[in-house]
């Protein structure tokens, strides 16, 4: 009987270890920006791949909330108060979502954290909705990428995938 229990425990341990070590199809990634004076922002997300698929308007439908990545919802952490696209965001941890459209995107900054991502049911926890700038990239981007480009005293948070770039300016308050 003890051998059976030891065998079952060993199998559970092995399966748990195998699952934990398995490579995720959409690996974790992050973007950071130093706003100066010890003020920083950090965005943590999972980076899905295009894999020959049509993304916007198909895999990611226009006009619907998208978690801006894969797996867990994308997090946005700021060490101090910032201004995102004209809206004040107090220091803290947030979840960000987007609503993509062909010519206009909306960034949603949400107080609810620790969520998987979709379906979106957190309207009551929204801090702000911000318009994003949208432009076309000259060549397709295979891996969904969030980056913070330093610009003057702030950063431009950009999301690139397929042939689309959505961006918004962030400054320290």
Regions found by a protein language model. Give the residues of each.
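Bacterial N-terminal signal peptides that target proteins for export
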Residues: 1-9
């Amino acid at each position: 009987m003890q051998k059976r229990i030891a065998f079952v425990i060993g199998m559970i341990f092995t399966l748990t270890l195998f699952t934990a070590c398995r490579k995720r199809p959409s690996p974790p990634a992050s973007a950071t920006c130093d706003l100066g004076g010890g003020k920083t922002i950090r965005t943590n997300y999972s980076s899905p791949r295009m894999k020959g698929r049509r993304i916007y308007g198909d895999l990611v439908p226009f006009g619907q909330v998208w978690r801006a990545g894969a797996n867990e919802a994308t997090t946005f952490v700021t060490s101090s108060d910032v201004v995102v696209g004209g809206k004040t965001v107090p220091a803290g941890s947030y979840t960000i979502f987007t609503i993509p459209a062909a010519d206009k995107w909306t960034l949603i900054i949400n107080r609810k954290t620790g969520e998987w991502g979709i379906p979106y049911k957190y309207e009551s926890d929204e801090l702000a909705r911000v318009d994003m700038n949208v432009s076309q990239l000259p060549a397709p981007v295979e891996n969904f990428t969030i980056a913070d480009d330093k610009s003057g005293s702030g950063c431009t948070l950009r999301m690139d995938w397929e042939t689309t770039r959505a961006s918004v300016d962030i400054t320290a308050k």
